[in-house]
Amino acid sequence: MPWDFWLIFLLLGVVIPWRGRARLRRLLAKPPLGSLEKLVLYASTIAFQWIALAAVAWRALGRGLTPAELGLEHQRTGEIIVAGLVGAAALGSFQWFNLRRLGRMTGPTPERMRKLAERILPTKTVERLPYCALAVTAGVCEEFLYRGFAMAALQRTAVPVWLVVILTAALFGLAHAYQGRSGIMATGLMGILFGLARLVFGSLAPMMLWHAGVDIVAGIAGPRFLLSTGECA
């Protein structure tokens, strides 16, 4: 594997998880963020993800990975659109009911999720559209990084396909280490599902829709079920 690919995997496996946990510690040490602070957080995260995508795409294409290998080409357009929309609706519904369940629970995990929601999820109208832009960015950029580049790079080595799916899911879970152990497990399992779907469809498009849909629902259902109604406006 080329040296620059190793650097990218170092970014995915070490730098991004460390950065996420460090940012979360700083956020949790502060009182709940105001609208301006949330908008700055959303904008900085959007910028970071698009810069990461551009840098990784530059090195991937420069090293000979093709758009097809990266999941950027597809032949069955109708099937992919239907799969994307149906999957987004199904996973979004699951996210909705899971957050409703968490909102009724007590204990360390629900309390951590409430603190996280209080600081990063939109609670006012002015915050919602920028949050949706962040959700779409995460859907596009993270799917390219983990199901596009990482799977393509590993598949060019002697790593078996089943292990490629597990390794990239593990990296995806670590990227969400700021959510705690349950967050790592949940996103890791979602990463396995997305990795298998990537193999089935040969395209990132369905997973991008699924990922964005799950995050958008989190921005709607999270404040509704995890925070008191008085905090939303």
Describe every region a protein language model picked out.
Residues 1-73, 78-79, 162-163, 219-233:
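N-terminal, membrane-interfacial amphipathic/helix-forming hydrophobic leader that caps
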